Amino acid sequence: MEKRLLDFEVGETVDLFLLIKSSVKGTASNGKPFLSLVLQDKSGELEAKLWDVKESDEANYGVQQIVHLMGDIQNYRGRKQLKIRQIRQATALDGVSASEFMETAPINKEEMADEITQYIFEMKNANLQRITRALLKKYQDDFYDYPAAMRHHHEFVSGLSFHVVSMLRLAKSVADLYPSVNRDLLYAGVILHDLGKVIELSGPVSTTYTLEGNLIGHISIVVEEVSKIADELSIDGEEVVVLKHVLLSHHGKGEWGSPKPPLVREAEILHQIDLMDASLNMMDKVLKHTKPGEFSERVFGLDNRSFYNPIFE
């Protein structure tokens, strides 16, 4: 099987077509311009620097461009980085398209939509069910295409819906173990907690923050959406207030982006399973490319820790 970008080890030479996920111009200590590139294929992404760039290079090696690249995998501060030897734009004769380089969720969109719909169908509280169904219907096209984040966890096509499906399965297990849990409130919180990402982020390809993302953020966005849809459906009362609290508090702490800590049972569960699923996704991503008996590269989103891949099974 042909090796992909993250299959290469430090010291090996890469000769691949890759998609430029991001391209940022900088100035080196010697005063010369360079480009900081993030290059990706279906296996993931790596950073690279293109030194001594000309003005034409900014256009040739911008976001969403496909390039053919030769270079070496190096270790830079505990992380793999690509040192570029040669780079050129791909042409029509190369016969490559952007979709070939984009990581996607391991479950297809139709299966995820069916599973999420089943959880909504199981809700017994009519108000929570109506709000959840209406918001998901309003944004369903983007919801099943968007990543869950720009970086760190589930940052791939359909990553948002895959994150939600994984969390719904965790939520069901918790509710099965603890009968006091309000399933309807928990399921609604899981399905809606990151829905604001479809407004906060630009899309599944070369994802950036939108104006709303930079100035408001996905938590405030989804709470505003809940308020609007509740008004449209003539729903008011405690359910709406508590649902908004569950969504507002799902990051757990003020320093992590939540204006309130979790103050109801389901809010605390949502925070914990969100953190668990995101953390395990980040670990799996690096351990997948770590040999048994070795430590992974450092994971910035997990306190810059390296994780050990045990030899035994």
UniProtKB/Swiss-Prot annotation:
Alphabetized CDD domains for the sequence: HDc, YhaM_OBF_like
Domain of life (superkingdom): Bacteria
UniProt keywords, alphabetically: DNA-binding, Exonuclease, Hydrolase, Nuclease
GO molecular function: 3'-5'-RNA exonuclease activity; DNA binding
Entry annotated with the keyword Nuclease: yes
Gene3D superfamilies reported in the protein's UniProt record: Hypothetical protein af1432, Nucleic acid-binding proteins
Signal peptide: none
EC top class, as a word: hydrolase
Start-end of DNA-binding region: 22-90
Biological function: Shows a 3'-5' exoribonuclease activity.
NCBIfam families for the chain: PRK13480.1
Assigned protein family: Belongs to the YhaM family.
Designated name of the protein: 3'-5' exoribonuclease YhaM
